[in-house]
Structure formats: structure tokens, C-alpha cells
Amino acid sequence: MEIGILALQGSVSEHHMIFRKCGVAFHDVRLPKDLNGINGLVMPGGESTTLRKLLKNSGLWKELKKGTIPILGTCAGAVLLGNCDDDTLGLVNIDILRNAYGRQIDSFESEITLETDEFDGISKFPGVFIRAPQIEN
């Protein structure tokens, strides 16, 4: 089995890391020809308006809209798979509210303190709090 990772923008490197750690075969998808031979596609988080434009410009939008490839979308990927006021792929019957927790400009970083010994002595790390979408229905 081989999974494609949509590599136009967003959290691509984080998906590479996890797939390697799990021993999953994958390759990046940037053009329609990159869809050949994959059993599924992951659409990582990022910025949905930018991602939509890149998908359309690359020719991938038309291919994905056919609905012939299983797709897992996180954050911006989920926004584009579901139904919302924007132009979406509409492949998953869910209603998505973009920026449900505020505008992206309101995202921030803050230090998080862990009250556990489960992370090899790490007690603090920088947390990134984004204004994520919300699945409403």
C-alpha cells in the first residue's frame, strides 16, 4: 500500500515524519500524474484558500473532484473535502465552519507545561494554537 501526501503547502513535513515512523510507504503529490499508484491521499492542514488555488492551478482539483481516491483531510484538507460556504470538493457530507475559533491572525504560540514524566524529561515546549475549523454536522 502507498499513500500520497498532498505537498502543495501546509504541514507536509510533519506527515512525512509520522509516515516514516509508522513504516508507511508514501510519496508527495503535486501534479495529477503523482496520483498514479496511490491507495489513498492525505490532505494536510494549511490555509484552505491558498490550498484551493494551488489545487486548481496544478490540475489536481479536477482529478480529486471525481471522488475516485480515498482522502483523509486534516484542518484545511477537511474544509475542502466538506461542505461550507466556499467552493469545496464536497466529497464528504459534513458541514464545516472555517475559522470557528476566530481569524487566523488570532493564532498564537505559548509555552505549555507538562505535568507528567512520560516525555523523556521534557516538561515544557512551545504550543501553537491555531484557529481551526469546526465540524458542525
Describe each PLM feature range:
Residues 11-12, 30-31, 75-78, 134:
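Short, polar loop motifs at secondary-structure junctions
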Residues 12, 35, 80, 114, ...:
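Flexible, glycine-rich phosphate/dinucleotide-binding loops
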Residues 47-113:
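Cysteine-nucleophile active-site neighborhood
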